[in-house]
């Protein structure tokens, strides 16, 4: 009975989703090709909400870490996924893996943590997420829920001997497009404070990207693509901070 109810709810949701997209086509003039692309994206999201297949083939082909190599997984949302994409390389020569998925909340990250971090034999993980929770993308977003998800990921990591680095969310600004309506700056600041406190209480390394990218409360315009994502200059600021945090985390393990 419960399964039938769940299936019925999913069907109703899908119908509502399709209806909303069809309405969008009539109201915004989407072409048939654009509509099909959007429907396919929504259908994929319904099939694989947590992105379990996103890195499936890459993970399967990944060799074991070289002897003495400290594999580190950068685990997060679009801030992580976009890192190194334009240049086609991610920390060349370093045993670092990018396992970011754009648009994900920490709830989705938690579901795929085992296959995208633990199963890859990581020595350390940088957990970077929360901005999409604040924007309430796909899951309800509260500071408490983000912390619960980060705690759960940390517990899984510790149980598998993986050092944890908790990263701040990055700032936003309305310098290109409106970002602060969905991601109020005060909420981002509050979440960062909670993440910092959690890291301190738990003996974890806190990686403060936010402080290096912000001017007042705004993302520095020269360091962002659209007020949300860092540009190449922004990632250049973030890279040494991440490297320093990795050294600190791995030193704690020795």
Which residues are covered by each model-predicted region?
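Charged helix-capping and loop-helix junction motifs
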Residues: 142-151, 185-191
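Surface-exposed amphipathic alpha-helices with a cationic face
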Residues: 154-158
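Structural recognition of the beta-strand scaffold that forms the well-ordered cores
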Residues: 71-76, 96-100, 124-129, 164-168, ...
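N-terminal secretory targeting modules
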Residues: 1-75, 80-81, 85, 90, ...
């Amino acid at each position: 009975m419960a399964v039938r109810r769940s299936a019925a709810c999913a069907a109703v949701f899908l119908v509502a989703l399709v209806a909303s997209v069809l309405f969008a086509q009539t109201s915004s003039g989407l072409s048939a090709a654009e509509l099909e692309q959007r429907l396919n994206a929504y259908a994929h999201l319904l099939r694989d909400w947590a992105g379990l297949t996103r890195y499936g083939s890459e993970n399967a082909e990944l060799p074991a870490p070289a002897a003495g190599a400290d594999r580190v997984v950068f685990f997060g949302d679009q801030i992580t996924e976009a890192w190194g994409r334009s240049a086609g390389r991610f920390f060349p020569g370093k045993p670092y893996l990018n396992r970011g998925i754009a648009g994900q909340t920490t709830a989705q990250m938690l579901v795929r943590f085992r296959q995208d971090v633990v199963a890859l034999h990581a020595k350390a993980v940088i957990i970077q997420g929360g901005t999409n929770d604040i924007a309430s993308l796909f899951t309800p977003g509260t500071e408490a829920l983000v912390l619960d998800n980060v705690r759960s990921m940390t517990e899984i990591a510790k149980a598998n001997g993986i050092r944890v680095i908790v990263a701040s969310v990055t700032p936003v600004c309305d310098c290109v497009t409106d970002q602060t309506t969905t991601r109020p700056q005060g909420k981002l600041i509050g979440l960062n404070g909670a993440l910092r406190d959690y890291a301190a209480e738990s003996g974890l390394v806190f990686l403060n990207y936010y402080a290096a990218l912000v001017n007042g409360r705004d993302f520095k315009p020269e360091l962002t693509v659209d007020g949300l994502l860092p540009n190449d200059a922004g990632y250049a600021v973030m890279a040494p901070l991440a490297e320093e945090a990795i050294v600190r985390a791995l030193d704690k393990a020795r």
